[in-house]
C-alpha cells in the first residue's frame, strides 16, 4: 500500500526583526501594502526613511514590527520607474512595468496634451503604450475622437476602440490577450471609464480594494490610492488615481528627443551633433516639420517639454 505523501508544514511568517521579501501592491502617501513573497497575509508597511522612494510594483525587503505591520528596509533593483514631476516635487506611479495603457473616451473631451505626455513617458521608460478609446457607443462624439487620434495611429501606436459598459465582452476580448503575462499600468483622466474597465478585467477588484482600504485603516474613496491587481491569465494591472497634469521635468533633452518615434530616424542627420531641434540651421527635425513629415502639435509638445526640463537644476 502506497504511503500518503507527507504534508510539508507552512513556512512561518517572518517574526519581528527578521527580514522578509515581498511586493508592494498598494500605496497612499507613506502607507504601503506589501504582499509577502511566501504567500502570507498582506501587511501595512512604512518606509524607514522620512523621504519615501517606494512605488507600487517594487520588490522590497521588510522587517515585521507587529502581526500586521512592518518597515520597508530595502528596495530591490528596478527595471524602470514611471513618475511625473514638476519644478518642486515628483509623484511616483509604479515600478517594474511592461506596458502603459492610456484610457480616453469620446466624452468627456480628453486632453491631447496629457495623451502626448503619457506616450512620451512610456517611450522614455521603454514601455509598450496602448491607447484605449472608450465609450464608442456615443456615436455623435466618435468621428471627432477618431480624427484627433489619427496622427497617433499614423505613428504606429496601438489604438483600441471599445465600449466597456455597452459591449463588455468585446472589450475583454480585445484587452485580455494584450495584458496577459505583462505588468500594465492604467492611466487616464477622471471620467474616462477607468474604474469600470478595472472591474471588467479584475472580477474581484471591488472586494480587493475594500480589503486594501481596511489594511490602510481608511475609508478612503477607491480612486485615491494606487494599487496592483494580479490578473487571472498572469501579469498584473496597476490602477492609478486620475490626474490632470503630467509633468516630465526630470527627462533630459537627450531622453526627450529619443522619446518621439518620428524624431529617431532623423537625429543622426542634423548638421550639429548637439542640435536642440528648436531653431538651429541644418536641423533634420525642423526640415521634417517644414515639409509636413512631423506634426506641428508634436514639435510644439517637444519644445514645451524641453523648456520645462531646462527649469531643473541638475
UniProtKB/Swiss-Prot annotation:
One of several proteins that assist in the late maturation steps of the functional core of the 30S ribosomal subunit. Helps release RbfA from mature subunits. May play a role in the assembly of ribosomal proteins into the subunit. Circularly permuted GTPase that catalyzes slow GTP hydrolysis, GTPase activity is stimulated by the 30S ribosomal subunit. Monomer. Associates with 30S ribosomal subunit, binds 16S rRNA. The keyword Nucleotide-binding applies. HAMAP family: GTPase_RsgA. GTP binds at residues 134-137, 188-196. Its main location: cytoplasm. Its cofactor is Zn(2+). This is Small ribosomal subunit biogenesis GTPase RsgA. Gene3D superfamilies: Nucleic acid-binding proteins, P-loop containing nucleotide triphosphate hydrolases, Probable gtpase engc, domain 3. GO terms for biological process: ribosomal small subunit biogenesis. Belongs to the TRAFAC class YlqF/YawG GTPase family. RsgA subfamily. CDD domains: S1_YloQ_GTPase, YjeQ_EngC. Binds 1 zinc ion per subunit. Residues 85-246 form the CP-type G domain. GO terms for molecular function: GTP binding; GTPase activity; metal ion binding; rRNA binding. Residues 1-21 are annotated as: Disordered. It comes from the Bacteria. One of its GO terms (cellular component) is cytoplasm. It holds the Pfam family RsgA_GTPase. Zn(2+) binds at residues 270, 275, 277, 283. Keywords: Cytoplasm, GTP-binding, Hydrolase, Metal-binding, Nucleotide-binding, Ribosome biogenesis, RNA-binding, rRNA-binding, Zinc. It is an enzyme of class 3 (hydrolase). Its EC number is 3.6.1.-. It is found in: Cytoplasm.
Amino acid at each position: 500500500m502506497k504511503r500518503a505523501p507527507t504534508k510539508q508544514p507552512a513556512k512561518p511568517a517572518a517574526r519581528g526583526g527578521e527580514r522578509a521579501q515581498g511586493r508592494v501592491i498598494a500605496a497612499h502617501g507613506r502607507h504601503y501594502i506589501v504582499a509577502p513573497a511566501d504567500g502570507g497575509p498582506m501587511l501595512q508597511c512604512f518606509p524607514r526613511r522620512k523621504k519615501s522612494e517606494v512605488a507600487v510594483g517594487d520588490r522590497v525587503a521588510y522587517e515585521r514590527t507587529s502581526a500586521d505591520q512592518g518597515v520597508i528596509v530595502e528596495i530591490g533593483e528596478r527595471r524602470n520607474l514611471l513618475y511625473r514631476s514638476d519644478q518642486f516635487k515628483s509623484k511616483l506611479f509604479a515600478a517594474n512595468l511592461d506596458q502603459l495603457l492610456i484610457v480616453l473616451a469620446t466624452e468627456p473631451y480628453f486632453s491631447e496634451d496629457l495623451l502626448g505626455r503619457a506616450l512620451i513617458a512610456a517611450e522614455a521608460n521603454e514601455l509598450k503604450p496602448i491607447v484605449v478609446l472608450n465609450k464608442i457607443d456615443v456615436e455623435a462624439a466618435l468621428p471627432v475622437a477618431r480624427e484627433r487620434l489619427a496622427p497617433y495611429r499614423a505613428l504606429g501606436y496601438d489604438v483600441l476602440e471599445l465600449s466597456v459598459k455597452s459591449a463588455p465582452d468585446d472589450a475583454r476580448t480585445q484587452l485580455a490577450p494584450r495584458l496577459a503575462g505583462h505588468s500594465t499600468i492604467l492611466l487616464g483622466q477622471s471620467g474616462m471609464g477607468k474604474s469600470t474597465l478595472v472591474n471588467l478585467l479584475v472580477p474581484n477588484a471591488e472586494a480587493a480594494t475594500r480589503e486594501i482600504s481596511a489594511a490602510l485603516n481608511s475609508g478612503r474613496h477607491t480612486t485615491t490610492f494606487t494599487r496592483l491587481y494580479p490578473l487571472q491569465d498572469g501579469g498584473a494591472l496597476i490602477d492609478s488615481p486620475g490626474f490632470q497634469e503630467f509633468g516630465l521635468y526630470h527627462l533630459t533633452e537627450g531622453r526627450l528627443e529619443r522619446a518621439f518615434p518620428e524624431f529617431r530616424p532623423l537625429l543622426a542627420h542634423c548638421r550639429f551633433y548637439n542640435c536642440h531641434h528648436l531653431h538651429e540651421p541644418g536641423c533634420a527635425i525642423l526640415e521634417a516639420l517644414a515639409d509636413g513629415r512631423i506634426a506641428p502639435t508634436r514639435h510644439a509638445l517637444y519644445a514645451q517639454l524641453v523648456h520645462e526640463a531646462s527649469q531643473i537644476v541638475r
